[in-house]
Regions:
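N-terminal alpha/beta PP-like core and its mobile active-site loop of ThDP/TPP-dependent enzymes
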Residues: 2-236
Length: 236
């Protein structure tokens, strides 16, 4: 396990994003995660500042929709987070990989009805595949890499990570962030046999397409496949 000396929690967040290939972040800035914004400033990651959190979340949703990689969104606590829930819900319904980082009140103010405090595990459970809170800055590399894995594995969807403000400014030694390993999903042999049987016996077949990762090559390949069988195609 490699450590690189003491860094703030904000720096560790950005290092973990870079380790996982992030090149763009959408956000609405807020005081609760200023340490992350400071680290982003010289990171080389493009930071798109939005006027409203719902738009920032939907921008991240669109990135995930077009690339198959998790879109990254950052918002502040309380109303910032609840505004972002609209984009989170869309990503959940449409199976789009996305990670929403939310600034949170400092750890010693939790469960004390602090200003703009929200219990996100309860609030966002229906909107996300996983909702986690990073209480220990040393575990940031672990949490962020796990968020990427959860967002992209099985049925893709959004993940929420909350970031206590004091945790982000704490300086700690932490292991070097590692990239997640994408798990490719594809039909098995029996599923393909079933598909072939259904297609052969269908009286009026039609393909309905959806999901992510539709590259130019994938579109051309499916176009040739559908045309060879003379089957119409629709999109969800």
């Amino acid at each position: 396990m490699t450590t690189l000396g003491k860094r703030t929690g904000g720096q560790l967040i950005v290092e973990a994003l870079k380790a996982n290939g992030v090149s763009r972040v959408s956000c609405v800035p807020g005081e609760s995660y200023l340490a992350v914004l400071d680290a982003l400033y010289e990171s080389g990651i493009e930071t798109v500042v939005c006027r409203q959190e719902g738009g920032a979340a939907m921008m991240a949703d669109t990135w995930g929709r077009l690339t198959g990689e998790p879109g990254i969104c950052m918002v502040t606590r309380g109303p910032g987070a609840t505004n972002a829930s609209a984009g989170l819900h869309v990503a959940r319904q449409d199976s789009i990989p996305m990670i929403l980082f939310i600034g949170q009140v400092q750890r010693d103010a939790r469960e004390r009805e602090a200003f703009q405090e929200v219990e996100y595990r309860r609030a966002f459970t229906e909107f996300a595949k996983w909702v986690g809170e990073i209480d220990d800055a040393r575990r940031i590399p672990e949490f962020v890499t796990r968020a990427f894995a959860v967002a992209t594995s099985g049925r893709p969807g959004p993940v929420v990570l909350t970031l206590p403000e004091d945790m982000l400014v704490e300086e700690v030694e932490a292991p070097e962030a590692k990239a997640y390993t994408p798990v490719e999903n594809h039909p098995g042999r029996k599923q393909m046999e079933k598909f072939t049987d259904l297609l052969a016996n269908a009286k009026r077949p039609m393909f309905i397409l959806g999901g992510t990762r539709w590259s130019e090559e994938a579109v051309a390949s499916f176009k040739n496949f559908a045309e060879s069988l003379k089957v119409p195609v629709g999109c969800s």
